[in-house]
Amino acid sequence: MSASRFIKCVTVGDGAVGKTCLLISYTSNTFPTDYVPTVFDNFSANVIVDGNTINLGLWDTAGQEDYNRLRPLSYRGADVFLLAFSLVSKASYENVSKKWVPELRHYAPGVPIILVGTKLDLRDDKQFFAEHPGAVPISTAQGEELKKLIGAPAYIECSAKTQQNVKAVFDAAIKVVLQPPKNKKKKKRKSQKGCSIL
């Protein structure tokens, strides 16, 4: 096995979309039953990927506007962002492109973003929608469309409660850092065209 590599993974997104629950579900295989606003301590875990040891540093951020000035301090040195929205909150879905992507591109240009749809277990929950008449479910197609719009390399829907696809979210984050998309070659070819002054 090779020496371990550190990857800093930062979660961002609106308040109450399930960022902290996603991290707790991944790191402890449990789901907190009460809403706990961002109390997840920064966490570090060794993960084996393709025979390589990865030291995965997980950073949680608060989505509420009160933290707009402090939150970007967490972005320094980030290797990848998990940008989360709730699959039962149209506002959080819309804020991905309105608020979060501009903020991330400003403070951390070039850092890849994995788009994450949370609360998958609630999307088909009739009781949830009966109790929340204003809630609008976000379809997989809408998530894929948003992924293309923001240029994210991956879009994953998950449920921290049932743990469905939770590991896949973090696997995708690690993979995009270890094997970045190969679109830089095209740019190099364009820049190789010379300029002649006669």
From Swiss-Prot:
Transmembrane segments: none annotated. GO terms for biological process: anisotropic cell growth; auxin-activated signaling pathway; cortical microtubule organization; petal morphogenesis; positive gravitropism; regulation of auxin mediated signaling pathway; root hair elongation; root hair initiation. InterPro entries: P-loop_NTPase, Small_GTP-bd, Small_GTPase, Small_GTPase_Rho. A motif (Effector region) lies at residues 35-43. Interacts with Rho GDP-dissociation inhibitor 1 and ICR1. Binds to SPK1 when in the inactive GDP-bound form. PANTHER family: RHO FAMILY GTPASE. This is Rac-like GTP-binding protein ARAC3. It comes from Arabidopsis thaliana (Mouse-ear cress).
